Amino acid sequence: GDANVVYNKATNVMTMAGTLVANNMTTGSGAYAFRTAKVKTGVTTTTSAVEICATEASTVSAVDYTIVATDVSNQSRQTVKITSAIFATTVNYTEYATISVGSLLADFAVTYVPGDAFRNAQIVLYATPATTNTTNYKILVDEYSSS
């Protein structure tokens, strides 16, 4: 094995020296699954509302978002924190933190979108940008299990 990664079967503990890199990470497994952290991205070039992130509705009871929006041509960056609670088709959310360098780049909304022939029902994060400049979004999504 690798000396930087050690698994102790007796204590059921894995120890790692160094950096762990992952795009998805789940806390808990099986019946104990609780939270999955995912990294997602989006881009807008319009002032209309755009879906920048979606999560299958049947799998979550809550979703938290950390959004970093960047408009290089406007030399602006906005960071936003949103938390949401989901039950069946009802979604309540609050944007509880926003800070920016330069201009505010977008408003955000979290909505339940019913399923159709192409995809199951989704919890969707929409961005409504302030300009038509290209705005890039990096999103850390924390999905809390519905089971």
Predicted regions and their residues:
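Beta-rich globular "head" domains
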Residues: 51-87
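Low-complexity intrinsically disordered segments
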Residues: 102-147
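A short, sequence-level motif marking secondary-structure junctions
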Residues: 4-11, 83-89, 143-145
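Residue-level recognition of well-ordered beta-strand positions that form the cores
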Residues: 19, 66-68, 126, 142
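Terminal beta-strand-rich extracellular "head" domains
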Residues: 83-105
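Surface-exposed loop/edge segments in extracytoplasmic proteins
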Residues: 35-37, 75-77, 91-94
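Broad, structure-driven detector of short, well-ordered beta-strand segments within folded domains
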Residues: 5, 78-86, 108-117
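Intrinsic low-complexity, repeat-rich intrinsically disordered segments enriched
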Residues: 1-49, 59-60
